[in-house]
Amino acid sequence: MKISCCIPGGSFMPQGEKEVPMSSYDRLTEGCRVMRELGYDAAEATVGLIMALTDDEVSALQAAHRAGEFSLDACNSFIPGHLPIITDEKGTAALYDFVDRAISRMASLGIRYVVFGSGFVRRIPEDCDRAAAEAQIDAFICQVDACCEKYGMICVIEPLNKAETNWCNTVAEGAAVVRRLNLKNVKLLADGYHMSREGESYDVLAENRDILLHCHIASSDRKIPGTTEYEGGFLDTLKEIGYNGIVTVECGFGDFREEAKIAAEWLRAKLA
């Protein structure tokens, strides 16, 4: 099992020290460097950071990746808020164009997984026919699968708790979508924080080990893992079922360097 951490949107600096504003390029390169320094195997970034890069910056990161100096395993926050999935024909065309450009760019940087969380853009409007909306989400996922096939990536569906969206709130529901669509490049993510919010049993991990390719971890109050009970059982279950993918710390931080290091040490100790 590999351990990873999301590159934070805030400061890399210890509390009390001023950080110079960073470009997307600098945040990505510094983020990957800091994760290695803190004891992680990999890093996870947002798709927004990737899409904010200039063409020259993409070329520089491609060269760094080929040289083994830059590595991201996954990206999250896939779809920006101005591109809802439940939309009209013109909106769908813009959405699908973004999907193709984003997956193409991520693949060119050696990124293997894209996380379909994006709770806001997948929310089904109250006044919308739910069956029709779910059909639109299915069509979107099929389009993502086609782009992943084209560029050599995998999309993992991330169930999110009911406070964040009203479609696919549990790992069991996410697994049902993955199995029903049965697409080559669309698999499942389990997030311990969202599972704890929904009161979901660890059993769902064992039941879906065959399609579970990526995991997120945090405490039940979305702080670093190792501070509440649920995430310990979550990680123990992943070990028991022989999960051999990535576990990424995705949480809020106070002092990033200090807390991310503590989280890495806790993960290493639990996995030993």
Language model features: what each stretch is:
Residues 1-111, 183, 210, 253-254, ...:
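N-terminal pre-domain/capping segments
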Residues 17, 42-43, 75, 138-236:
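Acidic/histidine-rich catalytic cores of soluble enzymes
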Residues 21-33, 67, 84-187:
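Active-site acidic/histidine proton-transfer and metal-coordination neighborhood
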Residues 22-24, 46-59, 82-86, 122-125, ...:
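Acidic-and-aromatic substrate-binding clefts and catalytic sites of carbohydrate-active enzymes
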Residues 61-63, 91-93, 132-133, 173-175, ...:
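Short, hinge-like loop/turn segments at secondary-structure boundaries
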Residues 233, 242, 254-266:
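Short, charged alpha-helical segments
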Residues 239:
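Catalytic-face loop-and-helix region of soluble metabolic enzyme cores
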Residues 246-251:
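Short acidic/histidine-rich active-site segments
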